[in-house]
Every structure is written in C-alpha cells, then in structure tokens.
Amino acid sequence: MDEISVQKLYKYYETINDFNRLRILICLTKGDYTKEEIATILNMKPIVVYTHLNYLVAKKIVSAYVIKEETEDADAECIYVLTNREIKKILISDAKHINKI
C-alpha cells in the first residue's frame, strides 16, 4: 500500500473514531434519515446527532440534502445519507468481522 493510501485510511479511521459517530454511520447503513429520526432510533439528543452529522458531512463521509427549506420559525430540514456505497460496504463488513476477533 502506498503512502497516500495509508494517509487516506488513517483519515478514515480518525473520522469514525468516536462511539456516537460510529453509531450514526451504522444507522445510516440501514437507510437515509433526518437528524430527528437518527436521534430517535439511537436514543440520542438531536443536538448531539446534529453536531456529529455536521462533522461527518465536512469529512465527506455523509451527504445532507435539504428536504424542507428554512423558515422564520424553523431551521431547514435535511435528510442524511452515506456519501457512497463503498463506505456502507466497509462499515457492514467491519461489523461482521469484528465478532471473529
């Protein structure tokens, strides 16, 4: 493996190196959700989910799509999805293999 690939792999693991972030990513392997839906599914506070989602979007592992525009009374509502299928495959594969260790 070349140096650039090792750096990319390091950045990937650095990004998922948080228990709640990893829970959110695994949740997103099962479908696309709003932050409120993720918070409900994982029994987490929406602000905590939102903070982690912003981080994951900034790292380009998760994408956010506006489904309801911001108004005077409410923030915009987004649906969150894993950026690509390969990340989903990696997460599912890691989860399956971890029990064999």
What are the language-model segments listed below?
Residues 1-22:
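Short alpha-helical segments that sit at the start of domains
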Residues 19, 30-37:
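Short capping segments at the starts of secondary-structure elements
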Residues 37-41, 56:
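A short acidic, leucine-rich amphipathic alpha-helix
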Residues 47:
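Key DNA-contact positions within bacterial/archaeal DNA-binding proteins
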Residues 52:
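Residues within the DNA-recognition helix of helix-turn-helix
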Residues 59-74:
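Beta-hairpin "wing" of winged helix-turn-helix
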Residues 70-101:
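Conserved segment of winged-helix/HTH DNA-binding domains
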